[in-house]
Amino acid sequence: IPDPTTAGDFCRRFTVPDIEALMNVFNETRLRVWQQQPASFFELAIVEADGTVVPTTGECKEGMDINHKGQWGYHALVLSLANTGEPLYVVNRSGNRPSHEDAARWIDKAIALCRRAGFRRIVLRGDTDFSQTKHLDGWDTDGVTFIYGMDQKPNLVDIANALPEGAWDRVKRPAKYAVKTSPRRRPENVKEQIVVRRKFKNTRLCSEMVAEFDYQPT
């Protein structure tokens, strides 16, 4: 194990092209490993995009910045194969950069990698930060499915409110866990008692409803 200062000096020698070349080497090896999987493995690839905050307490870290929560550090873009949890691409960015910045280029790289591997279907997944409307048509034309969140914009709220009551279905979520022994008595909820005693407004989820409608962003 090298001395920390030696390891840091070695890592700082890597430029962006060096790191991209290293990720490409990993992925070339990954392709060969995947070929050992059964045919069912290649039925579907779920490519997940996420912006991950990497905080630091250092003061001399090159490229760090402060984010909207007041944290110093970096905001890495992580593209992973959700089926296995493998990180396909990790892109370091300054801490104040938005999640979607340069994401489409790396998503396209992940799609190309999965195509080379032989996946028959590809699904992109992520939160609202990755639903970049200028790229959706291209992915759809390319036969790629995507599941992205959409911001609660007024026009979408109006469409949802105008749907007939019969268009909505209750969301059924599986239990978080199964009790393998006898159920135990729940302890007293101290927080709930304080909320009631002080007459705070207590908003609780009663149910979730879902509906589908066609929508094409402009």
Residue ranges and their predicted role:
Residues 51-54, 61, 84, 94-96, ...:
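Short acidic/polar capping segments at secondary-structure boundaries
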